[in-house]
Amino acid sequence: MENMNDKWKKIALEAVPFLLLWAAFFVFGLWLRRQIPLDVPPGELHGLDYNGHGELFADHRLITFTRFRHPLFGWLMSPIPLFGARIANVSFIAYWGYLSFIFSGIVAASVWMVYRISAQMEGVGKVSAAVCAGLFACFGYVRYLAAGPESFSVSMLLALAVLWWGVRSPFVVGRQPLQGKGVYDKLVWFLLFVVATGITLTQGAKVVLAYLVSRRMTKRDWICLASGAAAAVLAAVGFYVVKLMLLGSGGRTVSSAFADLFSCIPHDLTIVQRLRMLEMFFFEPIVPHGVPYSVSEIVVAYSSWWQYALCAAIYLATAVGAYRMRSTLLVKMIVVMFCVDAVIHLVMFWGMSEAQIYCGHWFYVLPILIAGAWKKGVIKKPSDML
């Protein structure tokens, strides 16, 4: 009984910084709620443009939370929706300021966590660990500016939760299950599931899949089987979502809706144009959500050869690190969830923007995998690194 009390006391002490951080967000949200001009039309940007895509930004980024991805997203993003405020009426500057406040706190903690993880890997010195943490900060910053105030704060919160859980639990980073199968691990899994589900239902499904893989399916054959099964299920869900988006309340049939969707895809393309589309699909970093890829604009595109070279170098280092760490459960879960993301984006006609390992939901694994390229990723002390 005494040990259980000590465990709960430890959990409570570790949760205090996160609770204080959320309390700060809550108070700031109360203040910001008083600054919202409620007479502004939804999506109005007050004449501000966003990299030449102000119309897209107004329609996509500042729309009401209930129409964006998942209703829980609004609750996780800020306390504003709890007080009946319409996020569509938040001015661009006020909304950006709020996310900047979240960014400054969470990214600092996340970068520190990345440094501690990398520094504990065999063969990775403190300087190299600092480089990995710097890479994390750079990519997080790029994601923040490139994608705009969409889901960065919650993605950072999810990244921090994964890192915190991964560091504290020897089950994730170790080769075999060790300790930590009790209440503590279950609690962190549950919190991670809540946060992920708040982003999208598919993110929550991927957390459940990762839990099953890490607990029961440790062989590579089972990994492939789980990836295929999950991809099939999520593909079906994806088509169902597309159907709902297209049908709406107009009473159209499913066949006519899909006919309209596929009619948007150009078929009279040359070989060069098809190769260009393939290149854009896999290598352009940002594609607007909810818009068929074949008819959407690219918000961020590479303009110089060295940017593509840097991208290729990062891909190579990440692949080498993943291969060298292929026996760890962490990499196995990443592979499974990456496969699921790829299927989702293929089905939904989005680019591979979030499915790419260096962007979106995946950028936080970069420093760990790149560190693994230096030395095979074996954590010395997976527990008690905080």
Predicted regions and their residues:
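Membrane-lumen/periplasm interface segments of specific transmembrane helices
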Residues: A24-L30, C224-L310
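Extracytoplasmic catalytic/substrate-binding loops of multi-pass membrane glycan-assembly enzymes
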Residues: F28-L56, T64-I80
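Transmembrane-helix motifs of polytopic, lipid-linked glycan transferases
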Residues: F101-E122, A317-G321
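Hydrophobic, aromatic-rich transmembrane alpha-helices
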Residues: M113, P288-Y293, S304-T328
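Transmembrane-helix signature of polytopic, membrane-embedded enzymes
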Residues: V114-C138, K332
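Short acidic/glycine- and proline-prone juxtamembrane loop motifs at membrane-interface regions
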Residues: Y144-F152
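Specific aromatic-rich, kink-prone transmembrane helix
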Residues: V154-G174, D185, V365-L369
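Membrane-interface alpha helices of multi-pass inner-membrane proteins
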Residues: Q179-R216
